[in-house]
């Protein structure tokens, strides 16, 4: 992987900051297209490093170091190689930049606090969204456990007040090349407000933990993720945090795929499952999805269905639907080109034929909704479905 991270701001200076992962982790370099010279920037940092901006004099870079789901800002002097950590609250940095006067502004959020624009060295935010501020959320706790292959898997927990065990939601991120960070997520806080502990698992295939971790899924999708999510569930039960009779699995997009694949291949131990815009029937999804997604699937599976037919069938949730032993909510957009409607309807029809309890919620949009009222409605649907099947979960207010 190689990508541009921004040209030098000085007129006549053709240098470009670039990013590459050939070391196994994302690292910056400086490239001069005129001379062809490339200088890798040696950094003693354990995580992934991105370039947010140049200083106006082009003598330093503003770096974002991502490690274990949290971000740190640093100033790298390109002349001396000195790395200066910039002080700021813990959390995730969505954007950062250096202003003409040298001030560093950044957009920060955490599990406990909604996004705001802050300046390094300032006590208060410099910009906030208009209107009332979001109420403070429950802070995330860093969480690690061992999977079935002996790997350390990292994630986060958001836990309601009071002693456990709690009804628990495993909220599986999409992507699959994405990761859950210590960042503001109203969905997590909504579940916590209704009495659930929430586990966020950065399964094998997630970004943020190095190239080897991210590439595990190549040629083997739909197995490592499920193993890691199940190991996370079992760890929370062993800790006494999760009630073993009240565990819900949910996720959107690839998280919805993991949800359906988990309840079909590891059917025991789930009280309910909620799959939002999921892949449910892989052969049908491949036929109907956009060309860009077909290319992604070919890279993930090692070929198309004509090349790896048996693998597509084995890693398709509809293949295992007869083993499903928990109520299922399917939520799907009528105009979704990433996880198309028909393949979810195929899965729903198989559930109906088998007499399995399920609900189907269709909405007039694509791969998710951007309209605020629709997103609120969807969250209410999820909470009401969970409450109907999990005795310890609270119903949302009317």
Where are these regions (language model features)?
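Flexible loop/turn segments at secondary-structure boundaries
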Residues: 1-3, 25-26, 48-49, 70-71, ...
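Conserved beta-propeller blade repeats
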Residues: 1-19, 25-28, 42-64, 90-107, ...
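Beta-propeller blade-edge and WD-like acidic-aromatic loop motif
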Residues: 14-40, 59-60, 67-85, 109-127
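Residues that line or immediately flank small-molecule/substrate-binding pockets and catalytic motifs
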Residues: 20, 65, 108, 121, ...
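Non-catalytic accessory segments flanking enzyme active sites
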Residues: 64, 70-71, 83-161, 183-189, ...
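Cap/lid segment of the alpha/beta-hydrolase catalytic domain
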Residues: 132-245, 252-253, 287-295
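Active-site-proximal cap/loop segments of hydrolase catalytic domains
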Residues: 203-398
């Amino acid at each position: 992987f190689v990508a541009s991270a921004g040209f030098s701001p000085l007129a006549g200076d053709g240098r470009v900051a670039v990013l590459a992962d050939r070391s196994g982790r994302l690292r910056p370099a400086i490239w001069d297209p005129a001379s062809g010279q490339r200088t890798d920037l040696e950094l003693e940092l354990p995580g992934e490093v991105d370039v947010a901006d140049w200083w106006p004099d082009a003598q330093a870079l503003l770096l974002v170091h991502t490690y274990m789901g949290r971000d740190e800002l640093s100033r790298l002097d390109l002349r001396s190689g000195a790395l200066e950590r910039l002080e700021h609250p813990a959390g995730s940095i969505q954007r950062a930049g250096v202003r003409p006067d040298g001030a560093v502004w950044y957009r920060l959020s955490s599990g406990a606090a909604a996004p705001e624009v802050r300046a390094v060295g300032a006590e208060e935010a410099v910009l906030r969204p208009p209107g009332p501020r979001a109420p403070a959320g429950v802070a995330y706790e860093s969480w690690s456990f061992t999977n079935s292959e002996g790997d350390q898997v990292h994630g986060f927990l958001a836990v309601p007040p009071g002693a456990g065990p709690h009804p628990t939601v495993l909220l599986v991120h999409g992507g699959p090349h994405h990761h859950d960070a210590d960042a503001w997520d109203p969905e997590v806080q909504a579940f916590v407000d209704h009495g659930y502990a929430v586990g966020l698992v950065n399964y094998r295939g997630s970004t943020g933990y190095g190239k080897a971790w991210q590439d595990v899924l190549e040629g083997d999708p739909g197995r490592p993720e499920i193993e890691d999510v199940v190991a996370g569930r079992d760890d929370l039960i062993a800790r006494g945090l999760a009630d073993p009779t009240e565990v819900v699995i949910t996720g959107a997009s690839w998280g919805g795929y993991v949800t359906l694949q988990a309840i079909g291949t590891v059917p025991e131990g789930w009280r309910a499952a909620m799959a939002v815009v999921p892949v449910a029937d892989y052969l049908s999804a491949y036929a109907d999805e956009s060309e860009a997604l077909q290319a992604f699937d070919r890279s993930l599976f090692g070929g198309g269905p004509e090349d790896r037919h048996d693998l597509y069938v084995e890693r398709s949730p509809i293949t295992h639907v007869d083993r499903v032993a928990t109520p299922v909510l399917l939520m799907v957009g009528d105009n979704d080109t990433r996880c198309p409607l028909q393949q979810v309807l195929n899965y729903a029809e198989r559930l109906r034929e088998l007499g399995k309890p399920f609900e189907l919620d269709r909405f007039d949009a694509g791969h998710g909704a951007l309209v605020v009222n629709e997103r609120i409605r969807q969250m209410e649907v999820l909470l009401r479905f969970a409450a109907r099947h999990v005795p310890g979960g609270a119903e949302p207010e009317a």
